[in-house]
Amino acid sequence: MDLSKFEQRLECLESRMAFQERTIEELNQVVTEQQMEITKLREHLRLMTERLKATQPSMIASQSEETPPPHY
């Protein structure tokens, strides 16, 4: 191969590498934003779960409220 073909291949590889680096940076930004959103949603879910537990009585009776079985 002559020098010009090597230069063309090198330019092509450099171009592809630059494109891949840009793509990786963009994907990293998306992942970071999604992680922040997941963290926020988890906190909202935790708060909603606490509110739901506080407003609704438990469907399971405590042992003191439970009636004994009929054979007692």
Curated annotation (Swiss-Prot):
Cross-referenced Gene3D superfamilies: 1.20.5.300
Compositionally biased spans, kind Polar residues: 55-66
UniProt xrefs under InterPro entries: SlyX
Chain segments carrying region Disordered: 53-72
Pfam families the record matches: SlyX
NCBIfam families: PRK02793.1
Family: Belongs to the SlyX family.
Listed name of the protein: Protein SlyX
Lineage, highest ranks first: Bacteria, Pseudomonadati, Pseudomonadota, Gammaproteobacteria, Enterobacterales
